[in-house]
Amino acid sequence: MITLQRTPLFDVYAKYGGKTIDFGGWELPVQFSSIKEEHEAVRTAAGLFDVSHMGEVEVKGVDSLAFLQRVVTNDVSTLKVGGAQYTAMCYENGGTVDDLLIYKRGEEDYLLVINASNIEKDYEWLASHVIGDATVVNVSSEVAQLAIQGPKAEGILQKVVSEDLKEIKFFKFKKDILVDGIPALVSRTGYTGEDGFEIYCKSEDAAKLWEKLLEVGAEEGLKACGLGARDTLRFEATLPLYGQELSKDITPIEAGIGFAVKTNKEADFFGKATLKEQKENGAPRKLVGIEVIERGIPRTHYPVFIGEEKIGEVTSGTQSPTLKKSIGLALIDVKYAAVDTEVEIEIRNKRVKAVVVPTPFYKRSK
């Protein structure tokens, strides 16, 4: 029997009604109250997520920038201390190793935040391509991560932080902030389509911080949230999930994150030739939004057809709690990717009518 990994917060899940599942080898809460309630809390008030299963890798040294420029697609040279950047790592053929965040903590000090299911693979990939005076250290087990997301997230977090959180702009962060006396790195980032913060602290401090935030946020409607709501929220905001919208067989251009691929940067990064070609001449496939017109919910790997021709497949799909519609993301032949194109999805051996629609499905009002 495989032993599932647990985050430092595992022992407090039950107190808040957490129902756990096996998620990529981790025993994590899929929900606390209900996915719908948690989803709505984040869209209208605030939600608190345990994302300590995510991986953290430190890259340090004189050659850390040169090294990162070689292994990621975005231009890390534009990043200033106190800034965060979304990027991808690719194989030489343009397929995706992972998508990740890079935090620049110092001139020769970067923190990479990677997907839980890819920690070992990513670390080996990074370590095997190290150049010059750069070091790569996997610190995942030492670091916990909480995410507080939603329109009321700032007000709630401000109760336990003395620094003015308004000074932390989108994709910026402050390190060494005290959150209820606990040292943490606090960044205005997230995976929900809402405003909010991600808080990195030592593993041993996570449970205390979790309980404190839920206590001070109770009157504003802060709810403990699980993976179910995290997935429906990121899906509505059309944020890719590795293993679904991104994989070793799907390039960042196909997945719609071309903004994180800078083919004009000087460094010859892995996948550059393929990604440059796709940026300039178009990729063969495109990730599109689809709305099901008839009954049925599109799920991962369901085939998409026009007539008898299979043109692609669904990468993610759900009944959207916000839009009250059955929607999906699908990677399809670029010839059929225009909005309003009528397609069919095979749901349980039955063809169901659907239409290509614009994305993101949800965008918060500023």
Curated annotation (Swiss-Prot):
Gene3D superfamilies: Aminomethyltransferase beta-barrel domains, Aminomethyltransferase fragment, Probable tRNA modification gtpase trme, domain 1. The keyword Transferase applies. One of its GO terms (cellular component) is glycine cleavage complex. NCBIfam families: gcvT, PRK00389.1. Keywords: Aminotransferase, Transferase. It comes from Bacillus cereus (strain B4264). The gene is gcvT. Signal peptide: none annotated. One of its GO terms (biological process) is glycine decarboxylation via glycine cleavage system. This is Aminomethyltransferase. It catalyses: N(6)-[(R)-S(8)-aminomethyldihydrolipoyl]-L-lysyl-[protein] + (6S)-5,6,7,8-tetrahydrofolate = N(6)-[(R)-dihydrolipoyl]-L-lysyl-[protein] + (6R)-5,10-methylene-5,6,7,8-tetrahydrofolate + NH4(+). The keyword Transferase applies. Pfam families: GCV_T, GCV_T_C. The glycine cleavage system is composed of four proteins: P, T, L and H. Belongs to the GcvT family. SUPFAM superfamilies: Aminomethyltransferase beta-barrel domain, Folate-binding domain.
